[in-house]
Amino acid sequence: QNQGVDIRTAAKVASINLKGSCVAGVTLENGECVTTPLVISNADPVTTFTNLLGLQNMETGMARRVSQIRNNSGTAKIHLALNGLPQFTRLTDEQLGHRLIIAPDMNYIERAFNPIKYQECCSAPVLDISISSVNDPTLTSPGKHVLSALVQYAPYSPIGGWHQHKQAFTDVVIDRISQYAPGLRTQIVASELCTPADLEQNYGMTGGQWHHGELAMDQVLMMRPFPGCSQYASAVDGLYLCGAGAHPGGGVMGLAGSNAAAEVIKRGKKA
């Protein structure tokens, strides 16, 4: 803000506006129009081009490439509010501040993945666990902790719907963690399982794909998100991508955003 930036929250964008083939601004859901010749989107590419820009405003070949982006997700996330620090077997309290992976071997990973091919939930998921309150005590009250885990693999829409499977799958995840942290279940104050469908609904990620596009060989490096849009600038003058759907992808490294900013500066674009 000291640099003249106006930061606005709760200002959801409804559409990207064009003047000819150039960006002219955005329209917010409340009907307000913000005029600008430069839009840098952190939304996933499908949301950006399909929902906000509109495929009808793109060249046919480019629109086809957008429609072919694969956003299938097999990732859920669980959050556990705990009344104490869980005790993982043979791990020190200091080690609990690191990333904990439950994936004993390749066969385990394959067995965890196989059910999703049939829209079923696995019985022994791969888990990527973090207890963020170990490193940041301000997240909770003294003595309390928060455990979060990425859960691989969970179908977007299991047979029968998530309303039939959500609690059972939550129990599967908790039981699996408890095998490594005995007594965990007695420490749980509250739990939340975010399915791929929840991630899509709550965070606007197409398909619940938290990488904004599958990390497959034909969707990474110079192919991300697709040929003709791999250098952050799109075919629409003034529209750029800066999120996980752009090279080199997501995570907490921020490189896609840094690279997009460098590209905007190189092209001499100004809002």
Explain the meaning of each model-derived region:
Residues 5, 11-140:
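Mid-domain catalytic core of redox enzymes
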Residues 18, 194, 265-271:
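Active-site-proximal substrate-binding core of FAD-dependent oxidoreductases
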Residues 103, 121-130, 183-247:
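A glycine-rich dinucleotide-binding beta-alpha-beta segment and adjacent secondary-structure elements
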Residues 137-144, 230-234:
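Short glycine/proline-enriched loop/turn "hinge" motifs that connect secondary-structure elements
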Residues 152-160:
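Amphipathic alpha-helix from the class-I
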Residues 177:
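Structured binding elements
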Residues 244-265:
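A conserved FAD-binding loop/helix module that cradles the flavin
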